[in-house]
Amino acid sequence: MSQIHKHTIPANIADRCLINPQQYEAMYQQSINAPDTFWGEQGKILDWIKPYQKVKNTSFAPGNVSIKWYEDGTLNLAANCLDRHLQENGDRTAIIWEGDDASQSKHISYKELHRDVCRFANTLLKLGIKKGDVVAIYMPMVPEAAVAMLACARIGAVHSVIFGGFSPEAVAGRIIDSNSRLVITSDEGVRAGRSIPLKKNVDDALKNPNVTSVEHVVVLKRTGGKIDWQEGRDLWWHDQVEQASDQHQAEEMNAEDPLFILYTSGSTGKPKGVLHTTGGYLVYAALTFKYVFDYHPGDIYWCTADVGWVTGHSYLLYGPLACGATTLMFEGVPNWPTPARMAQVVDKHQVNILYTAPTAIRALMAEGDKAIEGTDRSSLRILGSVGEPINPEAWEWYWKKIGNEKCPVVDTWWQTETGGFMITPLPGATELKAGSATRPFFGVQPALVDNEGNPLEGATEGSLVITDSWPGQARTLFGDHERFEQTYFSTFKNMYFSGDGARRDEDSYYWITGRVDDVLNVSGHRLGTAEIESALVAHPKIAEAAVVGIPHNIKGQAIYAYVTLNHGEEPSPELYAEVRNWVRKEIGPLATPDVLHWTDSLPKTRSGKIMRRILRKIAAGDTSNLGDTSTLADPGVVEKLLEEKQAIAMPS
């Protein structure tokens, strides 16, 4: 694999890069051998109210998983992202907002963003929100989403951002689990010319009898669309901030005070509230942003991720703003109203650094040269990829067509739980191979292990674990530390298990091969198979369901659901549509099955366990080696499934 064509470091990058190959080696070695010294120094990327004396205090030991960084230091995230830039760079653009409609865009300076955040912080205080309270944010991609998040951090409230594509049921579940006191939303969102009924979804979520903690709903007027209104509970954003002062002293927070909860799909069905704290998280987000994107003051940076995902937290907002960068926030989609929209936005705003997902890249690649028609993209210097492994063909297309064969592609591997980049190239320090995330970031100690947890040396393939802590690591799952230990530290003792498999080549470059557990990666978004199965079996006509992922050209993985109906029920085109809509309503459009495979029975072991390995192979059409079927209670089921599969039209 090391024989694959290597992309060398372009001269224009090498000439002014922040980290060259020699510096990377020296800094990486220090970060591993002397983490207290290394991170003690790197922590100075932030302004601290009370400087830390302690740096690292962590344990991955069974029954005693505990992660603390900079634990005696105090700071405020919003002050680091806003206040400290005002004197020198108050007039610099903090956020460029590009609307779904290309005629709508605006520039918001650091001074203006600071003013808006102070006003909203005072609004939150007036509504009785205190340090430690949880605030749910269900917003479109508008600057006010950033204002809401930063205002929470400013007063010490914990934000729980919920992706605007989630259904009312999913929203309710997250509000209940986190005990949110306030919901911030918008009348509607806008995406690819369509309105998204955000306020209606919140109304429906709050009808759930188990939602008892919410006192108010603050509503931003985005479209002016007609919405229901509950007097006393619902409040207009503009009415509230109008009366609020633009002066606010940021709350002094301990480095280990909670900053946000972000729900991510688990393999057991119930979404997990990943909890990040303030100090270590922001040090890590800022440092990774600066070095991985080789950020120079004045660069225009665009991360296409929604604020509802961790990428939107770390690399649309907090990392860039902590570094005083100009970050572009895009309400629309990369290929609407024309396939060249992404390239047009790059030219319009003279973007230097572009960070997007393989799903978007593959969708544009399918359009060929229409994706770059009428654009030159000459402002670009660095390209990035996030969300799932990028296949070499898409990587090469991205490098060649979007980046004009001159921009390094930083293919970043990380997770909601890691807070920031883990395995990634550095533009001036790493020769690139299409499809490889390359080498670990500072302080990250990856290892590949076999099923027993034994480390594998040299060029090999195995489960990807991290053997020691890093500052951006999630501290726990909200309200469930036992599940945190069980999920990430019980498979392999004294190691963090990522749930991903990987290959390491002769150059010690890492190639991520995908999930090894029951989590799907659809368009760069994680979905638990158990969550989708629970939604399916909740349908009154469905007896049983098993969900697997199959390869998909655009989305990376498509959702393939095996469904057995209750006795007396018959499959029909109407039921097919009804079941797909049912899942869409229960979880959201992302979770809609691409294929429903009606069947009478599923392959089970004698103990009743569904053999997913076999279902994956059948769904993917890989029937050459189904492996050991001797433990099946009824081996004949497999033949029947193979026959049924012949008649199924597969998504392209």
Curated annotation (Swiss-Prot):
GO biological process, one term: chemotaxis
Post-translational modification remark: Acetylated. Deacetylation by the SIR2-homolog deacetylase activates the enzyme.
Keyword Cell wall biogenesis/degradation: no
Cross-referenced Gene3D superfamilies: 3.30.300.30, N-terminal domain of ligase-like
Catalytic activity, as annotated: acetate + ATP + CoA = acetyl-CoA + AMP + diphosphate
Residues spanning the signal sequence: none
Domain of life where this protein originates: Bacteria
Positions bound to Mg(2+): 537, 539, 542
CDD domains xref list: ACS (cd05966)
Positions with a binding annotation for CoA: 191-194, 311, 335, 523, 584
Residues that bear N6-acetyllysine: 609
Family as reported in the entry's similarity comment: Belongs to the ATP-dependent AMP-binding enzyme family.
EC number(s) recorded for this UniProt protein: 6.2.1.1
Protein name: Acetyl-coenzyme A synthetase
GO molecular function: acetate-CoA ligase activity; AMP binding; ATP binding; metal ion binding
Pfam families per record: ACAS_N, AMP-binding, AMP-binding_C
